[in-house]
Design a protein with these regions (language model features):
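Short glycine/proline- and aromatic-enriched beta-strand/turn motifs that initiate or cap beta-hairpins
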Residues: 18-75, 88, 205-207, 211-213
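Residues that define the transmembrane beta-barrel architecture of outer-membrane proteins
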Residues: 42-48, 55-57, 82-88, 98, ...
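Transmembrane beta-strands of outer-membrane beta-barrel proteins
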Residues: 23-27, 50, 59-63, 98-104, ...
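Transmembrane beta-strands of outer-membrane beta-barrel pores
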Residues: 29-35, 56-58, 65-71, 106-112, ...
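Outer-membrane beta-barrel channels and translocator barrels
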Residues: 55-59, 95-100, 132-136, 170-172
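Outer-membrane pore/translocation modules
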Residues: 64-126
Length: 214
């Protein structure tokens, strides 16, 4: 339900008239891997994804959303329960050079049931580089620092990083096939009985999809 609402909002944004803009809508399917405390809490799963991007001149706004169903892996701790993960990513980029841009963003993650894993929000700041391979095809790499993380279960994260690799294949007319991989690690820390406990959160997402540009 939450993903459907965000998808409707993305379509509404994309439908707003703006001279000389390029709008891209996309949908896909993703495979995901989620871990807390290394292999102690290990989940895998999959689910649908949606995206919209609006480009105007040197500016680019991109919004991604996904809804994942995650189940415990066999090597995970006992008594773990499956959960759903909804995530929203918003990134605003400015092209600084022909192929390199600077991006600032915000991300929000919801987990249900909340006791199964951490929900959080955070800000991101990074760079993105896109390299054309052929007419209508390109590859892009992205890295970002994750800051200001606010966890529902408490704790802090002095360091977090995102890495991304995307490929856009030549398509037919306005349509293109896409594939991308995202990796995120957040070094969460909590304090118990007077001592500091390291509980890192690590996730990866591989997805394929189809986009249409207007």
């Amino acid at each position: 339900m939450r993903l459907a609402l965000w998808t409707l909002a993305l379509v509404a944004i994309a439908g707003t008239p703006l001279r000389a803009q390029q709008v891209t809508l996309g949908a896909g399917y993703a495979l995901a891997d989620y871990r807390e405390q290394a292999d102690f809490l290990h989940f895998t799963g999959s689910g649908p994804t949606a995206m919209v991007s609006v480009e105007r001149g040197r500016l680019a706004l991109r919004v991604d959303a996904w809804h994942l169903g995650l189940d415990p892996e066999n090597n995970a701790a006992p008594a773990l329960e499956p959960f759903t993960l909804d995530q929203l990513n918003v990134r605003l980029g400015v092209r600084a050079m022909s192929v390199v841009g600077i991006e600032a963003g915000y991300m929000k993650r919801w987990v249900d049931p909340s006791r199964a894993a951490q929900s959080f929000s955070a800000a991101t700041l990074g760079v993105r580089a896109a390299y054309p391979l052929a007419p209508g095809a390109e590859v892009a790499v992205r890295t970002a620092y994750v800051a200001g993380t606010d966890f529902t279960g408490g704790g802090s994260a002095p360091f977090g990083i995102e890495l991304g690799l995307s490929a856009y294949g030549p398509g037919s007319g306005r349509f293109r096939v896409t594939g991308d991989y995202e990796f995120q690690r957040i070094d969460r820390r909590t304090y118990q009985t007077g001592g500091r406990l390291s509980v890192p959160i690590q996730s990866s997402l591989a997805r394929v999809g189809l986009t249409v540009r207007f």
